[in-house]
A protein has these predicted regions:
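Eukaryotic scaffold repeat domains enriched in small/polar residues
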Residues: 1-241
């Protein structure tokens, strides 16, 4: 079995900017480990501490940390007969979650990638099963739905959006558009402004496993399923123009 600081099944990773802490979710042991980045880089014997044990209460499979009482994340709601993924607020201390109730009428099994921007009071849900993006304010109130050219209210058996990031005043999402069960993964990025207007598409040409926004250097960092595992795009050069 795993030791007290070993990770059984790694989950999401969140960043506490103020404390320079990484919060690493261990789905296997149902806890969050705290790694102080400064100590981790300077102490070869450094071991993480346990930030939170969450037992059987709902917890986000991905989240954006603001403080111990407020994070925004995506949650998987499961029951014997259903599976639904939705976004919402999360209090890490109490375990309380305020989830978005809205589900598009065409969507019976909601699967989403989420991104949030406190600066622009915007939360984005990008649908994995439909060519659909839903924009909310931070209170979870629907602002608009954005339908892409491959929208089909009956579903088309394809995987659509995979990951999302809000980069300044732009929404950047990775997109597949191929068979749900047999595809080569997301290889393109769609770019929208913060209100959901389409701006452009970028063909990366390599499978994008994950992406995030480096605000300090104004660039998108990508993890690729390729010989080159990491790459970045300059926001001003490729996205803003």
């Amino acid at each position: 079995g795993q030791g007290p600081t070993e990770i059984a099944v790694i989950g999401s990773i969140a960043w506490n900017e103020k404390e320079h802490d990484l919060y690493v979710t261990d789905n296997g042991q149902r806890k969050i480990l705290r790694y102080n980045l400064d100590s981790l880089l300077n102490d070869s014997l450094y071991a993480p501490t346990v930030k939170l044990k969450f037992g059987n209460v709902p917890f986000p499979d991905d989240y954006y940390y603001i403080n111990d009482t407020l994070s925004y994340g995506s949650f998987v709601e499961t029951s014997i007969s259903s599976f639904k993924q939705t976004s919402g607020k999360w209090n890490m201390i109490t375990g309380e979650a305020e989830l978005i109730d809205y589900v598009h009428p065409a969507d019976k099994k909601k699967r989403v990638a989420f991104a949030v921007s406190p600066r622009y009071n915007t939360l984005v849900e990008c649908n994995r099963r439909f060519d659909l993006i839903s924009l909310y304010n931070l209170d979870g109130e629907l602002q608009c739905n954005v339908y892409g050219p491959n929208w089909d209210k009956n579903g088309d058996g394809k995987e659509h959006f995979v990951d999302a990031a809000i980069c300044g005043d732009k929404i950047v999402v990775s997109y597949t558009g191929e068979d749900w069960n047999h595809n080569d993964g997301a290889r393109i990025l769609h770019v929208f402004n913060i209100t959901g207007d389409y701006l452009k598409t970028l063909d990366i040409g390599r499978r994008i496993n994950d992406l995030c926004y480096d605000e300090e250097n104004k660039r998108i960092i990508m993890n690729l399923d390729d010989e080159y595992q990491f790459a970045y795009l300059d926001l001003e050069k490729y996205i803003s123009n």
